[in-house]
């Protein structure tokens, strides 16, 4: 997006058939993935119509090597607000998944609105344990942090022990209902452990009435209000 490209986030758990559907339907020209997926696609000669570059968890790979050699790639490209920034595919509950085109203005206005509504500022520290191939973890959480100059603890996944370790240094947790169900099942969830957390956010799916009631009657209840 920084370089004017259109970004298509994809679940790394997709099968080859699913992956190829999204790549071909979106007419993608470049796939950035891990070495394992790259090797598998190339060995089966499925890498037709697009270039494959690799990147690993340590941020190194063929794409990072090329970026290091091409310093000019770091320079941002000016875009118009109505230019497409990303394509997000629907869940496909009523048929084959369809790509929704998200404009630069969509991302900016959403981040501005949520930053103001949630009162984010540079003093906030967000616990981020959401998948970044969904809009919640990728655009909602990340863009709000960038716009407000806040900080975040970027975790690979949601693990209770890790979350509790970060609570004392955090002011916000963004999660999904299952996060809060697991937190409520733990005896570690107390007023003391979450005393610095000013905001708990649940998205992606409805938070049931039962879970809401449990949150408000838990040992950490004062912090949810």
Question: What would you call each of these model-derived segments?
Answer:
Residues 2-66:
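Structural core segment of the AMP-binding/adenylate-forming
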Residues 4, 93, 149, 204:
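Conserved G/P- and acidic residue-centered "switch" motifs that form tight phosphate/ATP-binding loops
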Residues 70-89, 95-96, 119-125:
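Conserved pre-ATP/AMP-binding loop-to-beta segment of ANL
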Residues 31, 84, 90-93, 126, ...:
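Conserved S/T- and glycine-rich ATP-binding loop of Class I adenylate-forming
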Residues 108-125, 133-172, 186-188:
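Conserved AMP-binding/adenylation subdomain of ANL enzymes
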Residues 85-112, 223:
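Conserved AMP-binding A3 loop
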Residues 216-225:
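Single conserved hydrophobic/aromatic residue that forms the stacking wall/gate
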Residues 27-29, 46-56, 126-127, 171-175, ...:
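Conserved helix-loop-beta element of the AMP-binding
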């Amino acid at each position: 997006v920084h370089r004017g490209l259109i970004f298509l986030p994809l679940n790394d758990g997709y099968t080859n058939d699913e992956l190829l559907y999204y790549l071909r339907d979106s007419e993608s020209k470049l796939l950035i993935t891990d070495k394992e997926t790259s090797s598998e696609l190339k060995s089966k000669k499925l890498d037709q119509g697009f270039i494959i570059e690799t990147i690993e968890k340590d941020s190194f790979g063929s794409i990072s090597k090329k970026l290091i050699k091409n310093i000019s790639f770091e320079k941002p490209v000016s875009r118009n607000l109505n230019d497409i920034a990303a394509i997000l595919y629907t869940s496909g509950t009523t048929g084959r998944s369809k790509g929704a085109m998200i404009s630069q203005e969509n991302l900016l206005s959403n981040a501005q609105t949520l930053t103001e509504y949630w009162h984010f500022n540079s003093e906030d520290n967000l616990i981020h344990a959401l998948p970044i191939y969904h809009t919640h973890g990728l655009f909602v959480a990340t863009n709000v942090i960038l716009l407000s100059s806040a900080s975040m603890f970027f975790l690979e996944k949601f693990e209770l022990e890790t979350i509790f370790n970060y609570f004392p240094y955090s002011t916000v947790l963004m999660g999904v209902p299952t996060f809060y169900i697991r937190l409520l099942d733990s005896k570690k969830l107390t007023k003391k452990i979450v005393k610095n957390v000013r905001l708990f956010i649940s998205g992606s799916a409805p938070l049931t009435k039962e879970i809401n009631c449990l949150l408000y009657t838990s040992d950490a209840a004062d912090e949810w209000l």
